[in-house]
């Protein structure tokens, strides 16, 4: 049986919940990127990060930089969570010719940063509780929703933990091959 590890960064808890659901479905160990877990005993490392301000959290980027040589020798998978319910591509200016990003684009990008032999990557919805946000995140998300999503900032819960669990099961089945 392959040994698997989920490494995640989470700011408000949604990504941690998704990471736990994937770990449960996969039968994997789980660790925060902030503790810099040792990936060497593992055959598969799944990386997870939320998207904030169009980027991954620093702890996951730091983890990936520090472990690049080890990850290059392993199977990897990646997932992101996003506090946006994207029904369409999202860009920064609204111009037709600009580069647009979807949840899947961000998940693919995280997998590329991880290196290694990528098995799969996924984008999952997140949870947004406006009253829990710090001032910087509230300001950034109010701008994002007003100018890019063309709607007011509202709370929502798009976590789909059963889908995250099923994805973990799919990864396990693929590994068992």
Over which residues does each language-model region extend?
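Generic anion/oxyanion-binding catalytic loop in active/binding sites
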Residues: 4, 34, 153
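Gly/Ser/Thr-rich loops at beta-strand to alpha-helix junctions
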Residues: 11-13, 51-54
